[in-house]
């Protein structure tokens, strides 16, 4: 049963949409755009042509209409009831660029894949970005959550973030204003990141290539990179590795419906073929329960769960612990 009505929402926006150049899609299937390949419909999906188009759309969008921003579809799990309101999916054409921006500096659009920034840095002898080669997803998401790999975090290279607020006003946030900590920033969720400025340091291209090769080889060896997965499921608790806790709790390879904790890397959930959003989220909460009961540690989700449940298919967070 469909839980959203995109045509009705589109009609409510009035004649202002006639001037919008980007793509507006009512009742857009989210299982086509997320890496899990699961979940319900976006009531209305908007893909702006460029930043001016984004600002124009925001100015006609009523404040009471929910707005959800996604990147390339990694690191998110969409519930089967879909996402009410507008899902903003920035276009590669307008927000997927990566370019040099001064000595050892790189400017990347928020939808630019992390690995493209790593490649740009290598091609120009700029060190400090090899870790991006092993992170699935896009730069906007990396900046939002302080993504990291191989002992390096996004905040170590980030200079500033360009953003737009819900009313279409533009902002620039410094590294300090992002309020970074492990896999987290305090930047307002109302801000839509449009581009990010980074700075590295001079390094020989051969050395950078060797570092990137090591990252790629490690990732392909220990992670299910060819499966339908959103990336790391849970954050590492202080002093612990999430995968090790999951393994010790006996959850490696655990299956619920069409979802499984990967046997290769058990902090990765995978869609084995026909998993629903319910299967995936229920599996995650079951793992949290098992780890707490056996290890006494509460895992915190790294995957973002979006949207609403189908009636009768709700997933209750373990022990009343917040699922955020």
From Swiss-Prot:
Entries under InterPro entries matching the protein: FAD-bd_PCMH, FAD-bd_PCMH-like_sf, FAD-bd_PCMH_sub1, FAD-bd_PCMH_sub2, MurB, MurB_C, MurB_C_sf, Oxid_FAD_bind_N
Gene3D superfamilies tied to this protein: 3.30.465.10, UDP-N-acetylenolpyruvoylglucosamine reductase, C-terminal domain (3.90.78.10), Uridine Diphospho-n-acetylenolpyruvylglucosamine Reductase, domain 2 (3.30.43.10)
Recorded metabolic or biological pathway in which this protein acts: Cell wall biogenesis; peptidoglycan biosynthesis
Cell division keyword on record: yes
Domain spans labelled FAD-binding PCMH-type: 36-203
Keywords (A to Z) from UniProt: Cell cycle, Cell division, Cell shape, Cell wall biogenesis/degradation, Cytoplasm, FAD, Flavoprotein, NADP, Oxidoreductase, Peptidoglycan synthesis
Active site: 183, 232 (proton donor), 302
Localization, UniProt: Cytoplasm
Entry annotated with the keyword Oxidoreductase: yes
EC number annotated for this UniProt entry: 1.3.1.98
EC top class, as a word: oxidoreductase
Record-level GO cellular component terms: cytosol
Catalytic activity reported: UDP-N-acetyl-alpha-D-muramate + NADP(+) = UDP-N-acetyl-3-O-(1-carboxyvinyl)-alpha-D-glucosamine + NADPH + H(+)
GO molecular function: FAD binding; UDP-N-acetylmuramate dehydrogenase activity
Requisite cofactors: FAD
GO BP terms in the entry: cell division; cell wall organization; peptidoglycan biosynthetic process; regulation of cell shape
Entry similarity comment: Belongs to the MurB family.
UniProt xrefs under PANTHER family: UDP-N-ACETYLENOLPYRUVOYLGLUCOSAMINE REDUCTASE
Function: Cell wall formation.
HAMAP family: MurB
Name the UniProt record assigns to this protein: UDP-N-acetylenolpyruvoylglucosamine reductase
Species this chain originates from: Rhizobium leguminosarum bv. trifolii (strain WSM2304)
Gene name of the encoded protein: murB
